[in-house]
Amino acid sequence: MFTLSQTSRAWFIDRARQAREERLVQKERERAAVVIQAHVRSFLCRSRLQRDIRREIDDFFKADDPESTKRSALCIFKIARKLLFLFRIKEDNERFEKLCRSILSSMDAENEPKVWYVSLACSKDLTLLWIQQIKNILWYCCDFLKQLKPEILQDSRLITLYLTMLVTFTDTSTWKILRGKGESLRPAMNHICANIMGHLNQHGFYSVLQILLTRGLARPRPCLSKGTLTAAFSLALRPVIAAQFSDNLIRPFLIHIMSVPALVTHLSTVTPERLTVLESHDMLRKFIIFLRDQDRCRDVCESLEGCHTLCLMGNLLHLGSLSPRVLEEETDGFVSLLTQTLCYCRKYVSQKKSNLTHWHPVLGWFSQSVDYGLNESMHLITKQLQFLWGVPLIRIFFCDILSKKLLESQEPAHAQPASPQNVLPVKSLLKRAFQKSASVRNILRPVGGKRVDSAEVQKVCNICVLYQTSLTTLTQIRLQILTGLTYLDDLLPKLWAFICELGPHGGLKLFLECLNNDTEESKQLLAMLMLFCDCSRHLITILDDIEVYEEQISFKLEELVTISSFLNSFVFKMIWDGIVENAKGETLELFQSVHGWLMVLYERDCRRRFTPEDHWLRKDLKPSVLFQELDRDRKRAQLILQYIPHVIPHKNRVLLFRTMVTKEKEKLGLVETSSASPHVTHITIRRSRMLEDGYEQLRQLSQHAMKGVIRVKFVNDLGVDEAGIDQDGVFKEFLEEIIKRVFDPALNLFKTTSGDERLYPSPTSYIHENYLQLFEFVGKMLGKAVYEGIVVDVPFASFFLSQLLGHHHSVFYSSVDELPSLDSEFYKNLTSIKRYDGDITDLGLTLSYDEDVMGQLVCHELIPGGKTIPVTNENKISYIHLMAHFRMHTQIKNQTAALISGFRSIIKPEWIRMFSTPELQRLISGDNAEIDLEDLKKHTVYYGGFHGSHRVIIWLWDILASDFTPDERAMFLKFVTSCSRPPLLGFAYLKPPFSIRCVEVSDDQDTGDTLGSVLRGFFTIRKREPGGRLPTSSTCFNLLKLPNYSKKSVLREKLRYAISMNTGFELS
């Protein structure tokens, strides 16, 4: 009973709870329904009200209303309040447009104060409401301006409308209410306008104008009309002028308006009178004063992206070009702000491509994105930046240096005309280079005297820092900057004179001290040196030989001698003192700059001499010390060899080269030792098919085998092995014969240059089957000759040797400079085009080259479509370089690459990089000096009874010394060794050694030395008079076979005849 009662009670309570909850839910539902109904009714009511209001507004703006032009200002005010009350941009844009037109129409009414919309500002009851209303209307105009696209015709009309609204109500000059008696109201109205403008500025007015200007101007074809651009720029200026050029308003003006891409360019083209307003308010000076403060400049740059900082800089430079007087007075500030903006941009410049970089057409790889508008305007921005290195600005910046006079000697030196070999006569050149002209000495010698902390020096240093920063920041237009800086012929010589005057002693010591000082002053001085080197290097690179040696543009040859001496010492000290070893950043850039200028001068001197003997050597560097350091793997010694090997005497470098080869041979096991013999490769060559057999058997050999010992056995025309054992001699003959045949122009693998007949790959060598493999084989044979120290009489064209050394990969390499070594007449014709004063199009040239190839005229386009592009005064320099590059590189690119590949498979590139072009030729073909007979006599070996005191031998040396000319002595050497030039290191290094053997019989009967032949030769016993026989030779053994003549006159006659007829090219 009790349990049942408890159960019933629980059930009852639970049921009561459920009923209570249901009542609460129902009540909540009813309350929610009421709320929803209220919202729906409210929405419907609002919608109905909005619809009614919009209908009322639409009725108000009906176009066919005859009273529409004379609506009262109050009516417009009331309808505007209603529109603003429910305004939605997408839904009410047309109504807003009509409102604006109605307001502007009311402002144009004549003598009807009640119609003028602005008249409500004079009503005490409505003034505040009217001000608030016009603020809202104008800001909605700004909102529309941010969205409209100027390139669309309908949008451009709306832009004009909304700009007109902004122009009208931010300035009282067009308000008719202020005419006559209303003039007294102007101060109050001006105050209202200032209040309105302040409101707009607080809400981002300058951002709106920036968007509009950028959207309308930063495009392939600007689409802002003159009126629109004038209105927008006038609106931008108003707050600044009204605030009397307050810093608070100059800052946003610079950030938002002056950073619009190429704005000043567009203003000068479309509405130049706006620039007059800028000039009348001296705006450029105010900008300079604001930005020269480092903190403010940094703030502006950080507010802009790097790209827009560049736009700001371009606009300021353009303004500066229009206001030279301001720049003259504010040079220091202008230089400072330009340097700071460039430094800010440089922070985002990257050296290489990555996932985080974007390509910028001026800055290169850039760590910020580049928007479409900027890309479209980049050509205009670049033109603005060009003002920085334009002549007017350079004259203003460097006025202190350019105003100095360089004293000239009474008769300026003029170089002699170049010889056919394009070599300046050394005697006359050196005489001119060291004329004792006091005025020149004063210019060139590092006299010192100027305090480096003086205002004058600091100003020049700051300017040099600016231009050096521009070179490292604006990487893609670097050449343009260098060209602009070198345009004035006297700037660089005067800058060099200025550098020579710095410090207590001037010259080298000051700059070496700067390397060890990490002060701002030292960095600025080194930046000046870098700028001088970069510009001078660029200038000398683009000048041809006539301009350098004869016209002596910018630098006299005497100056180049002094500059090269300074650079040589500076680079050597940087390396030897250990500065380069760990160099990075600015120090590394300095070294690259100075070293680059040095090597341009050195290579030009190698091509055509202008320095005295031993000018490039360092007297304080002993080769023995350097070689000891190389053996110890000292870094500085390796760097000397890498960067400035020319400071070591040539003979020592050749010794070093031979040492390197020997060490490699030892490493590869190619040298015979007491415990092992090197592997020998045996080849059999048919004498009638020497080239073909040599090619087939050697081209398959491995690199190791090619460097090793190769033994040759010749087979004659009958198929019989020729007698004789090859102990390098037969291989030497084989190598010389192969090289002689492949370099024969008749084979058409190689051609000779006009004039001096030097060899280079034939452009038509492709007619040979497998011609590239042939060139690779030739490269291996040439490399093998150099590797073994076998000199071969193969004179190469200078430009081809440059390619063999890899000089053509240098950024400073100029094809035009090397062109005379290919075709001096063609070079003269091209340089005459450069100097042509008339209209070059009259010559009818195109960017193409017509060539007669085996009877057919072939047109080679220098660039794609070049045959349709005429050569003009603007592109003639490009034409000259393209033509030179085509003749010396493009035409023979594949052949050259194949030969270099073969050559480098034997000779490592780093081995020969320590030689200049002429030195490489000497390494290949021997010394071009006269034959040293005493050295030859000292290293001659005698056989067959001959000895140093034998009368025939005494006659021989006397004839060579007294009776033969230098040319005949060269012919004699070629007769015996097959090469007319002596070995580079002297005859001690001739392998096999120079030998003379007494012979009593003809070559076909000669069996070599026997006891009888030796005794007969020694005691001058003859079987018969050999007077009818000629001397012969075995070039493979460097052996002269000399009959035992009875008279000196007979020896002289026979020897002269033999060498002139070259009868001795035979095999023993």
Swiss-Prot record:
Annotated EC: 2.3.2.26
UniProt superkingdom: Eukaryota
InterPro entries: E3A/B/C-like (IPR044611), HECT_dom (IPR000569), Hect_E3_ubiquitin_ligase (IPR035983), IQ_motif_EF-hand-BS (IPR000048)
GO biological process: protein polyubiquitination; regulation of postsynapse assembly; ubiquitin-dependent protein catabolic process
Pathway: Protein modification; protein ubiquitination
Modification sites for Phosphoserine: 419
Described purpose of this protein according to its UniProt entry: E3 ubiquitin-protein ligase which accepts ubiquitin from an E2 ubiquitin-conjugating enzyme in the form of a thioester and then directly transfers the ubiquitin to targeted substrates. Ubiquitinates BCKDK and targets it for degradation, thereby regulating various metabolic processes. Involved in the positive regulation of neurite branching in hippocampal neurons and the control of neuronal spine number and morphology, through the ubiquitination of PPP3CC.
UniProt-recorded name of the protein: Ubiquitin-protein ligase E3B
Species this chain originates from: Homo sapiens (Human)
Organism taxonomic ancestry: Eukaryota, Metazoa, Chordata, Craniata, Vertebrata
Gene that this polypeptide is encoded by: UBE3B
